[in-house]
């Protein structure tokens, strides 16, 4: 089953040459990492988990580039598991694409139906459901960054509608079991999320810092409490919580790579969205 791009031409360029230029712009942007990394050879991976934003590239691309800089340096993963929030409300509580190609202007990424069934079998909450993915952007916008560096990607896209600590625990445990079954594979997990939405820049930076402190403390329940109590409008807090739980199981620590807002890239700081790039390593 083919999944065609839903946000090409809006969140990112729908022309392949222009899209490549946009990605290069993100890496060279003053908010970005400052250059394009050399793709490393496959081998030992010290950064298996990342947090990445998912807005329009002109806004969040330079922040996202920080995570992809480290990912690319360690070579092409065998499998990329991408966790994103469900913005549309379609589909089940936790949904994975059934299998087939995901298309973007830079080519196709493969969703292996057998691996999908295996992840579902070791998880208690993940359902096979294409409806949740048809118009969702949180996973799609990660693919061109990956495809810029790697051909013939194998991905497992999972979107989460029910964003509670309990669901995050189930998702993380299922992924952990899957990783243990495939200990010979190089598997990377991406948690796709933006941070606070539509407050002024200074307010957003303050609210975001509450969340970032909980990420640094590896406190996923505390993160959930902050989001709820302080009205921090993080759209993908379940993917972030799952990444923290999984990182603990893998004995990895968070390293904040970049925190900025859409105001830093657009110049308009009256109403912004916060973005965070984080890697998890030894």
Swiss-Prot record:
Q: Which Gene3D superfamilies match?
A: LigB-like (3.40.830.10)
InterPro entries per UniProt: MEMO1_fam
**CDD domains documented for this protein:** MEMO_like (cd07361)
Name the Pfam families for this protein.
Memo (PF01875)
What is the superkingdom listed in this entry's lineage?
Answer: Archaea
**NCBIfam families in alphabetical order:** AmmeMemoSam_B
Write out the similarity annotation: Belongs to the MEMO1 family.
Q: What is this protein called?
A: MEMO1 family protein Msed_2139
Species in which this protein is naturally found = Metallosphaera sedula (strain ATCC 51363 / DSM 5348 / JCM 9185 / NBRC 15509 / TH2)
